[in-house]
Amino acid sequence: MDFLTLAGQLNAGVILPEGIVIVTLLTVLVTDLILGRQSLRLTPALAITGLSAAIAVLTLQWNTSQNLAFLGGFNGDNLSIVFRGIVLLSAAVTILLSIRYVEQSGTSLGEFITILLTASLGGMFLSGANELVTIFVSLETLSISSYLLTGYMKRDPRSNEAALKYLLIGAASSAIFLYGVSLLYGLAGGETQLPAIAEKLGEAQPLALLISLIFVIAGIAFKISAVPFHQWTPDVYEGSPTPIVAFLSVGSKAAGFALAIRLLVTAYPALTEQWHFVFTALAILSLVLGNVVALAQTSMKRLLAYSSIAQAGFVMIGLIAGTEAGYSSMVYYLLIYLFMNLGGFACVILFSLRTGTDQISEYAGLYQKDPLVTLGLSLCLLSLGGIPPLAGFFGKLYLFWAGWQAGLYGLVLLALITSVISIYYYIRVIKMMVVKEPQEMSESVRNYPETNWNLPGMQPLRAGLVVCVIATAVAGILSNPLFNLASASVSGSSFLGLAPAAEVVTTTATPVALSEPPAAS
């Protein structure tokens, strides 16, 4: 094999965005080592520039015909491009939200950004991994970096406790997932690439394959915080640095769903009915427990933790539907969830920087002292609850419509009921912020310091908040382009083998389903 043939089979240009992130990571690390504390303003700019360049390259790779790299070990199709874009965007916004937070804590910003970029790199590779070894290495890169970020505030006992819990439970989850993958490898006769595994699995014993599926789903469910594999989520979210919680709730979760789609659809075609059943149970448990337990929370971060568990239940509806409309609505919801969830955490960060607390009761009367945070948090929470015309309403509408067309009537009705429950605890926070009587104002708000936007890191934090809030508001009204993007990413991914139950035609307001399926070709 000559060099040109090898280069053609490797097709390394597919992972050019990941290469840019690696170069950015090394540049940030070296800059921080050379300049030390003087690199405070330079390292975030370098990181965001590199992430922006990687996103630009991803857009140029859209609809390319040669999307397999490294002898089929990585798939750079349109679906992976969207998921990798979500990971990159969540990392970029997280950096904007982190600068002031990390600076005020007295820890190194350069090291923080380096670990965050490493986690992003793991999430990107996981979103396109098409081979078992690549999947596991990518998953561990993301996981280990997440453990380090969770315990990054070394002087905070809560951060140390959260990191230890996350590490212990995460290590057990990785071991379970690895055991399932090793069974899959053995049953496939030593094949590691997912398409080749699917071809060989017809000869496997059903019971052994089912055991493998159960272990693999357990590992994936941990990554997406699905009940009953959610125990780490509330404690880790409460004790971790708030910007890291924001990244874990969006970037890490998106990578987990990308893994779920690619691994389960490609490697377990014979057990589609079985894994749909398991995910239906996970979705029901996540919707009920996430929304019901959130009603009793007094900490804003714990409330958002249980909210993220419930949001995973909503996203699973699209996965269970298994149609083009289902996968498209799933991708669309993750796109808008990026902005509305990060926007909510940006408001929590701003409030905690000024008051040192995240207790919901301390938000009482906030609109009188900080209208920006009140407006931003209100819009993001209303969007998470699915109030029109915000982005979250259309995201849930598309998911429920796809689920209904796929015959998931009970699951969709349950999701509607739990969505109404979620509106209650979101509005409870908003009501707390807009109390009018001075005597109802909390002690933290009474002593609320005047905002000084000239402090280092405050302008990026405000920029991140404004971008997320505007995107949350506008993405609902202009939902067509985003949904078309999600639909194109799904229809262009051949491994899904879609036979849609109904074609979805979008308008600026609501999706319309054709009553008859498309004619067979």
From Swiss-Prot:
InterPro entries, A to Z: NADH-Q_OxRdtase_suN/2, ND/Mrp_TM, Ndh2_N
GO biological process: ATP synthesis coupled electron transport; photosynthesis, light reaction
Pfam families: Ndh2_N, Proton_antipo_M
Keyword Ubl conjugation (UniProt): no
EC annotation from Swiss-Prot or TrEMBL: 7.1.1.-
Topology of the protein relative to the lipid bilayer: Multi-pass membrane protein
Reaction(s) catalysed (UniProt annotation): a plastoquinone + NADH + (n+1) H(+)(in) = a plastoquinol + NAD(+) + n H(+)(out); a plastoquinone + NADPH + (n+1) H(+)(in) = a plastoquinol + NADP(+) + n H(+)(out)
Family: Belongs to the complex I subunit 2 family.
Function field: NDH-1 shuttles electrons from an unknown electron donor, via FMN and iron-sulfur (Fe-S) centers, to quinones in the respiratory and/or the photosynthetic chain. The immediate electron acceptor for the enzyme in this species is believed to be plastoquinone. Couples the redox reaction to proton translocation, and thus conserves the redox energy in a proton gradient. Cyanobacterial NDH-1 also plays a role in inorganic carbon-concentration.
Protein name per UniProt: NAD(P)H-quinone oxidoreductase subunit 2
Organism of this sequence: Synechococcus elongatus (strain ATCC 33912 / PCC 7942 / FACHB-805)
